[in-house]
């Protein structure tokens, strides 16, 4: 069952300007150390940051709150599997909100997709609730260790 859907579009040039203007103050407020390390080793860091910005916005919308009600930027984090597939991880109040919206007996899976085509970066997040039996039938979710199951 679908619990939430969120999407966001970010302007890479706007994120680049914010990075130039505020530097580490902006990076450290919005992005985890892991997200910063990935962005800084890429040829176009601003595009990587913009995709992660959009993913956090999309995730907050899928959680049904937007960036309010106590959800902090760093409560949502994007990492990549070895295959390059992005994975959304939630902690803090974002995790609490996810647990609140997940029905008893179900686990939540957060699906995220990212893309960019200069000057735009886009993210879409779908939060799905699965029973343990349904999760076992879904090899596309990968190993249980990478799932955001409640």
UniProtKB/Swiss-Prot annotation:
Keywords: Cytoplasm, Fatty acid biosynthesis, Fatty acid metabolism, Lipid biosynthesis, Lipid metabolism, Magnesium, Metal-binding, Transferase
InterPro entries reported for this sequence: 4-PPantetheinyl_Trfase_dom, 4-PPantetheinyl_Trfase_dom_sf, ACPS, Ppantetheine-prot_Trfase_dom
Pfam families referenced in this protein's UniProt entry, alphabetically: ACPS (PF01648)
A GO cellular component entry from the record: cytoplasm
Catalytic activity: apo-[ACP] + CoA = holo-[ACP] + adenosine 3',5'-bisphosphate + H(+)
Location in the cell: Cytoplasm
GO molecular function per UniProt: holo-[acyl-carrier-protein] synthase activity; magnesium ion binding
The keyword Magnesium is annotated on this UniProt entry: yes
Record keyword Magnesium present: yes
Binding site for Mg(2+): 8, 57
Domain of life according to the entry: Bacteria
Enzyme Commission number(s) of this protein: 2.7.8.7
Enzyme class, spelled out: transferase
Membership in a protein family: Belongs to the P-Pant transferase superfamily. AcpS family.
Function: Transfers the 4'-phosphopantetheine moiety from coenzyme A to a Ser of acyl-carrier-protein.
Protein name: Holo-[acyl-carrier-protein] synthase
Gene that encodes it: acpS
């Amino acid at each position: 069952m679908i619990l939430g859907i969120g999407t966001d579009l970010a302007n890479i040039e706007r994120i680049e300007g914010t990075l130039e203007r505020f530097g580490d103050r902006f990076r450290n407020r919005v992005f985890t150390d892991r997200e910063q390390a990935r962005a800084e080793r890429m040829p176009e860091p601003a595009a990587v940051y913009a995709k992660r910005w959009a993913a956090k916005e999309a995730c907050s919308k899928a959680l049904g709150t937007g960036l309010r009600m106590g959800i902090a930027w760093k409560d949502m984090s994007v990492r990549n599997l070895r295959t390059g597939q992005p994975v959304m991880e939630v902690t803090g109040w974002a995790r609490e909100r996810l647990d609140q919206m997940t029905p008893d007996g179900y686990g939540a899976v957060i699906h995220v997709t990212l893309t960019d085509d200069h000057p735009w970066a886009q993210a879409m997040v779908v939060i799905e609730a699965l029973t343990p039996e349904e999760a076992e039938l879904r090899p596309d979710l990968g190993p249980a260790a990478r799932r955001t199951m409640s």
